[in-house]
Amino acid sequence: MLKRALISVFNKEGIVDFAKFLVNKGVEIISTGGTYKHLKENNIPVTEVNEVTGFDEILDGRVKTLHPAIHGGILAIRDNKEHMSIIENKGIKPIDMVVVNLYPFFEKVKEDLEFQEKIEFIDIGGPTMIRAAAKNFKDVVVLTDTKDYSDVMDQIEKNNEVNYDTRKRLAGKVFNLMASYDAAISNFLLEDTEYPENLALSYTKSMDLRYGENSHQSAACYTANNGKGIMNNIEILNGKQLSYNNIKDMDIAWKVVWEFDDIACCGLKHNTPCGVALGENVHDAYLKAYSCDPVSIFGGIVAFNRKVDKKTAEEMVKIFLEIVIAPDFDSDALEVLKTKKNLRVIKCNTKPEDNFNIAKVDGAILVQSEDKLFAEKMEVVTDKKPTEEELKELTFAMKVCKYTKSNAIVVSKGCVAVGIGGGQVNRIWAAEEALERGEGATVLASDAFFPFDDVVKTAAKHGIKAIIQPGGSIRDKDSIKACNENDISMVFTGIRHFKH
């Protein structure tokens, strides 16, 4: 039987109706600060917490409910005679329900506030109360989510009580919330610490997904509570719900186009680029990216690093695409794209922000810094030196190579990735794949060094004029010799770009 409830909420949504319901069921309401005033203004009988504690709030509201009269009433086990005798002797009444939602640290940490202003949104009293209530969930109902009000009211209406399973579930939500809340605070304070002793992640479920990589796998999307990253800053302008594979592919395509200051377009399928190009405008960039592999781009994702115009939109709707993502769309371009009702049109107003990459293995999580370093040096190791135009082309090809599964080879012509070979267990197969597709290519990029000179010799047969690779093989001299014999320039970067 519920007799007393403590209500202290930052988010006032639904609280007046909920409190009225409790009062009508004979429940005494205790409240604090702003919540007390809000309930009072809505003519709800309410007792201010200092009347219970006999102690006024202090330190600008930092200390309101941290008192034995509150926590004794929450933590006392009702069927423990000693507990009940102690609180009775101390004049403490049991508290049967705690309704609290926390200071909005998740939201405030994203805002452009001073450090100390953000600190003030770290809740202390609220977490202490809900943790106490959750520990004693058998005797105390704890609510932290406005979405749970209706279910609790239904149960009280029907049974005059809240059942054990619901109490347990609500208690579990408390510790789940607190783990994420504390992780967000920890990450904020340790933002300059690369690898803390304990890894605390703070993400909130933003959507349930239809399924995972395959239809028999369940999936959901959780977004970072710090507000950073692509998934926190997208606007879906058209199309159906994003899928698990859509999100993974979109992430890579977006990262590819933002490797470049020039106008860029990336076509991507199965987490691998199938066409990447720079262009004079978005239409030119799209046509060039499409030309790299007109077959594979079908059913894929297209990303741009500039606003999309109508002319480009009219080209894209000629084929089936899953997603088009760009910083913005002209209004007439959007009208054209919306003629494809299932095409997901995504506007994203932020560049990629990931600094770390996380991979899960059985029983562990692996964390590494993002592969953002391009080259320690651009060392020409051959007799022939690449031209300035070839250096630009080599840089382009290597940046595409970075996002291609290893072993990866990319061949390019005119800053168009005409041949992409990836995911091969040996480098020569990747080279053969890229070169066979990349007719007319003039430069070649490799994500790792050449263990033998076979790639150079094969490249020479296909008319390659310049090569970029990390270097570092014990047989580098063999590849250099083969380049010199075939009038090919080659540069070493000193940086490997494996992608597994």
UniProtKB/Swiss-Prot annotation:
Pfam families: AICARFT_IMPCHas, MGS. Signal peptide: none annotated. Pathway: Purine metabolism; IMP biosynthesis via de novo pathway; 5-formamido-1-(5-phospho-D-ribosyl)imidazole-4-carboxamide from 5-amino-1-(5-phospho-D-ribosyl)imidazole-4-carboxamide (10-formyl THF route): step 1/1; Purine metabolism; IMP biosynthesis via de novo pathway; IMP from 5-formamido-1-(5-phospho-D-ribosyl)imidazole-4-carboxamide: step 1/1. Its EC number is 2.1.2.3, 3.5.4.10. GO terms for molecular function: IMP cyclohydrolase activity; phosphoribosylaminoimidazolecarboxamide formyltransferase activity. Keywords: Hydrolase, Multifunctional enzyme, Purine biosynthesis, Transferase. It catalyses: (6R)-10-formyltetrahydrofolate + 5-amino-1-(5-phospho-beta-D-ribosyl)imidazole-4-carboxamide = 5-formamido-1-(5-phospho-D-ribosyl)imidazole-4-carboxamide + (6S)-5,6,7,8-tetrahydrofolate; IMP + H2O = 5-formamido-1-(5-phospho-D-ribosyl)imidazole-4-carboxamide. GO terms for biological process: 'de novo' IMP biosynthetic process. Residues 1-144 form the MGS-like domain. One of its GO terms (cellular component) is cytosol. PROSITE patterns: MGS (PS51855). HAMAP family: PurH. Belongs to the PurH family. The IMP cyclohydrolase activity resides in the N-terminal region. PANTHER family: BIFUNCTIONAL PURINE BIOSYNTHESIS PROTEIN ATIC, BIFUNCTIONAL PURINE BIOSYNTHESIS PROTEIN PURH. This is Bifunctional purine biosynthesis protein PurH. It comes from Clostridium novyi (strain NT).
